[in-house]
Amino acid sequence: MKKGNPKKLDTSDMCGAKIAVQTGTVQEEEANTIAKGCEADNKAEVMSYKRQAEAATAVATGKADAFYADSPVAGYAISQTDGQLEALGDVEGVAKQGIAVKKGNTQLAEAVQKAVQKLMDDGTYMKILKHWGVESGALDKAEINPTDLD
């Protein structure tokens, strides 16, 4: 949303708001669910865009009141707006991110895991995440095929 929350938005009641989302995302589905739960005279308007950058731009230019996206995507968009946008509410449902390597290439997988763990241990990993505004998705341990993906 715009810095300072000029529309006085509240995540517990987005009825009446113009919500920008990227087409085909979970957030688009959730925004449509929110809109369906609003009274007819105070519906949330879901504005779908092909690219997330367009959704963020819609808020920065005043066409939309807020955009809804994954926390790393939202954090990056906010970091790119020179202070025009800010987050509203808490981060929910953080998903783990990964690095894909060819199946069976255990030597490469282990080398990548060790390199990422070194970046975590010396603080470089967090510096990188903070630079891009995506620290909400930070992990504390680099693993190969972790089983606790929630």
Model-derived features with residue positions:
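Ligand-binding clefts/hinges and TM-proximal coupling segments of bilobed small-molecule sensing domains
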Residues: 26-46, 87, 117-150
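Short helix-initiation/N-cap motifs at beta->coil->alpha
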Residues: 6-9, 46-58, 95
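A ligand-binding cleft/hinge motif common to bilobed small-molecule-binding domains
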Residues: 32-37, 58-93
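Periplasmic-binding protein-like
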Residues: 2, 79-117, 135-150
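Short amphipathic alpha-helical coupling segments at ligand-binding clamshell hinges
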Residues: 13-15, 70, 104-118, 124-128
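Beta->alpha turn/N-cap motifs
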Residues: 2-3, 22-25, 51-52, 68-75, ...
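Flexible hinge/capping segments at coil-to-helix
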Residues: 2-19
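Hydrophobic residues within well-ordered alpha-helices
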Residues: 14, 59-60, 99, 112
